[in-house]
C-alpha cells in the first residue's frame, strides 16, 4: 500500500 500524500508511506 502506498500513499503519495506529504512524504511517501509504503508498507
Swiss-Prot record:
Key word Hydrolase present: no
**Which GO cellular component does the record give, naming just one?**
extracellular region
Q: Which GO terms describe its molecular function?
A: toxin activity
**Tissue specificity of this protein:** Expressed by the venom duct.
PTM per UniProt? Answer: Contains 2 disulfide bonds that can be either 'C1-C3, C2-C4' or 'C1-C4, C2-C3', since these disulfide connectivities have been observed for conotoxins with cysteine framework V (for examples, see AC P0DQQ7 and AC P81755).
Q: Tell me if Disulfide bond is a UniProt keyword of this record.
A: yes
Instruction: Kindly state which keywords UniProt assigns to this record, in alphabetical order.
Output: Disulfide bond, Neurotoxin, Secreted, Toxin
Q: Where in the cell is it found?
A: Secreted
**What family is this?**
Belongs to the conotoxin T superfamily.
Domain remarks in the Swiss-Prot or TrEMBL record: The cysteine framework is V (CC-CC).
Per its database record, what is this protein's job?
Causes dorsal fins drooping in fish. No effect is observed when injected into mice.
This chain belongs to the protein called: Conotoxin au5b
Q: Which organism is it from?
A: Conus aulicus (Princely cone)
Amino acid at each position: 500500500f502506498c500513499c503519495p500524500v506529504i512524504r511517501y508511506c509504503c508498507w
